[in-house]
């Protein structure tokens, strides 16, 4: 590997790993996988996950005011960037302005998706930040189960 910065694509830099990724993609395409944590992600999701945003660590939350903005207001980059310059970013690490925009947009869209029965998107608190499996499972248990309910699990040992 002559280019230590790895500026080429995977097929060029490591054809063996590239071939394995293609084989795994084909395997997932041809089979119905009934393990929730291994469900097939759509191509658009895979593209987003492989974008430059994967290089960022955005600890904290975007500006709270974006919770009540419509999509077009959130996507007004010039206005948002001007606000960051004046007021600073509430996150611990700086330089995540576009990540803030993506997260605010995802947060708003999720709230709009679940707005129903007289509850508006502005009344719904949404957190779209990823969790590890254990806290995510506990959140689901707390949301859906009552004290004393039975949970079935697999013994994977």
Describe each PLM feature range.
Residues 32-34, 134-142:
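Short alpha-helical segments and helix-capping/turn motifs at coil-helix boundaries
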Residues 145-157:
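Conserved PLP-anchoring active-site segment centered on the Schiff-base-forming lysine
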């Amino acid at each position: 590997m002559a280019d230590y910065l790895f500026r080429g694509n995977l097929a060029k830099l490591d054809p063996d790993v590239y071939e394995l990724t293609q084989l795994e993609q084909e395997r997932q395409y041809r089979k119905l996988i009934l393990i929730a944590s291994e469900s097939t992600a759509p191509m658009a999701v895979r593209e987003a996950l492989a974008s430059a945003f994967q290089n960022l660590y955005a600890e904290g939350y975007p500006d709270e005011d974006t919770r009540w903005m419509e999509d077009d207001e959130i996507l007004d980059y010039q206005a948002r960037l001007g606000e960051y310059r004046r007021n600073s970013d509430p996150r611990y690490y700086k330089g995540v302005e576009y990540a803030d925009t993506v997260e605010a947009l995802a947060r708003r869209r999720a709230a709009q998706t679940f707005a129903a029965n007289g509850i508006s998107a502005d009344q719904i608190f949404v957190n779209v930040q990823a969790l590890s499996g254990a806290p995510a499972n506990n959140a689901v248990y707390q949301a859906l189960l009552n004290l004393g309910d039975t949970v079935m699990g697999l013994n994977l040992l």
